[in-house]
Amino acid sequence: MERYDKATLNAAFAPEFRQNEGSLTSTLRTLLFFTALMITLPVGLYFSSKAYIFEGTLGMSNRDSYFYAAIVAVVTVHVVLAMFVYVAWSEGTRQWREGKQD
């Protein structure tokens, strides 16, 4: 059985690990970005649309503005989810194509 020193093993596995590390970093960055969007955007749009659009501009009652602001928040959640799926799908096919060409 051959003995491999640490430098030889590191040199053999380093390029593959670094490629996976970049892919993992990119995936984590995408996930954190869309997580932040998923938390802040619907909540922010809920309160801002309730106060400024529905009650302020359109003059709706408090009860009606709650209802329509909730619809805005739900639509926003669906838009963010659709954007995440699109970006994740595009990133996955790009990585698959790059791996296929190697």
From Swiss-Prot:
One of its GO terms (cellular component) is ER to Golgi transport vesicle membrane. Residues 52-66 are lumenal. Its main location: endoplasmic reticulum. It is a multi-pass membrane protein. It is found in: Endoplasmic reticulum membrane; Endoplasmic reticulum-Golgi intermediate compartment membrane; Cytoplasmic vesicle, COPII-coated vesicle membrane. InterPro entries: Vma21. Residues 1-30, 88-102 are cytoplasmic. The chain crosses the membrane at residues 31-51, 67-87. It comes from the Eukaryota. One of its GO terms (biological process) is vacuolar proton-transporting V-type ATPase complex assembly. Keywords: Cytoplasmic vesicle, Endoplasmic reticulum, Membrane, Transmembrane, Transmembrane helix. Associates with the V0 complex of the vacuolar ATPase (V-ATPase). Interacts with ATP6AP2. Required for the assembly of the V0 complex of the vacuolar ATPase (V-ATPase) in the endoplasmic reticulum. Belongs to the VMA21 family. This is Vacuolar ATPase assembly integral membrane protein VMA21. It comes from Gallus gallus. The lineage of its organism: Eukaryota, Metazoa, Chordata, Craniata, Vertebrata. The gene is VMA21.
